[in-house]
Amino acid sequence: MALKRRKRASATDLYRTCKQSGTCPPDVVPKVEGDTLADRILKWASLGVFFGGLGIGTGSGTGGRTGYVPIGTRPPTVVDIGPVSRPPVVIDPVGAADPSIVTLVEESSVIEAGATVPTFSGSGGFNVTSSSTTTPAVLDITPSGGSVQVSSTSFINPLFTEPSIIEPPQAGDLAGHVISSTPTAGSHSFEEIPMHTFATSEGPGSSTPLPGIRRLARPRLNLYSKANQQIKVANPTFMSDPASLITYDNPIFDPEETIIFEHPSIYTPPDPDFLDIVSLHRPALTSRQGTVRFSRLGQRATLRTRSGRRIGARVHFYHDISPIPSDAVELQPLVPSSSPSITYDIYADPEVLDLPAQHTQPTLTVQGPSLSAASASTKVHNVTVPLATGLDTPVTSGPDVDFAHAPAPVPAVPYVPATHPHSIYIQGSDFYLLPAYVFFPKRRKRVPYSFSDGFVAAW
């Protein structure tokens, strides 16, 4: 079996490990240190040939430090920009006779402002003189005479004035008394829009309200889901005191809230339908199958794991409060009923006609379909109508009328045509077997049949 040749490590990896111990292969050290035969030829050739700044050799091929320069041009020079020099600050020379204290404010003359303090001479004090006037001071503001004419002019610019407050200035006299005024000028060009109150949030109706989004969306209760066990409770105590059906004690609870029960390990509830119930959710009123239904969702704790987790099914307990009867609507016929159905006798009744015995005919009653469309509740009446035949009609001849032949009586039976529009088969079938295939062996497939058409008649 041929062994697979392993690839040797790179020269760089071998050089790192074998350089210190001196066990490197003969081709590793010259390759890493650049001392191969090709490198030596380039070194020897560079001594006699100068390639300038082209960088031809074992370099990176970037054209040297200055890069590649077109023929006939010079490489660009780099101008070094030094720091910007600041102008010198002139410093005043300080001599030995100058003071060492520098004054911040120059000397100036002192200016005194303010009123002078009065000086009093003598010791007599002040003389106070008091006087009183009994006549009130009344000023007459009414003009002495002459009529006052007041005129006003207003210029309204709708571009700078709001339409709802366009009012002319009120006219008044010089004394301030109003003479005339107008309430408004022109008609208002605005529309009153009634304000609507948006939906406001109401306080929660219970101590454990649902979150905001779920409360507004009104989620479905899913009482009749396949995951819920349906149990009907016939005891009406389920609506007022459901805890009495689960435990014997009487805990203080709110019937509108969720009830949580703590049971011992072994116990028997008063109602066996509420076995292993640990919680009853808030009640709900629904209408289903024509009744008002009181429902509560319960949670069972049938199993309990070692970690303390309880496992059980959800149960829907419901109690039907009262039925909802359907409204009875009396239906009226759309088409008014006409005359009742009447059955007529074709031949006359001898008792009604009171004819001689030799001309009496046997009475034939033909009950056909009703002559009018009536409702099913209409009462059927049988009425005999006297109809005379040709024998009952007296025929006499006179000077002006000649009855050579008596008129033929109207037949009682409807006229039936002698020919029929459809074909009638008497003791026949709807197809015939071709006689040529009678003596052939029977086959289940490919047996031609010829129907009773022109082909059979011609054959």
UniProtKB/Swiss-Prot annotation:
Superkingdom, natural source: Viruses
Entry GO MF terms: DNA binding; structural molecule activity
A Gene Ontology cellular-component term: host cell Golgi apparatus
Compartments reported by the entry: Virion; Host nucleus; Host early endosome; Host Golgi apparatus
Record PTM text: Highly phosphorylated.
Keywords linked to the UniProt accession: Capsid protein, Cytoplasmic inwards viral transport, Disulfide bond, DNA-binding, Host endosome, Host Golgi apparatus, Host nucleus, Host-virus interaction, Late protein, Microtubular inwards viral transport, Phosphoprotein, Viral penetration into host nucleus, Virion, Virus entry into host cell
Main location (coarse class): virion
Pfam family, any one: Late_protein_L2
Span(s) of short sequence motif Nuclear localization signal: 1-9, 439-447
InterPro entries, alphabetized: Late_L2
Gene Ontology terms: biological process: microtubule-dependent intracellular transport of viral material towards nucleus; symbiont entry into host cell; viral penetration into host nucleus
Family: Belongs to the papillomaviridae L2 protein family.
Record's protein name: Minor capsid protein L2
Gene for this chain: L2
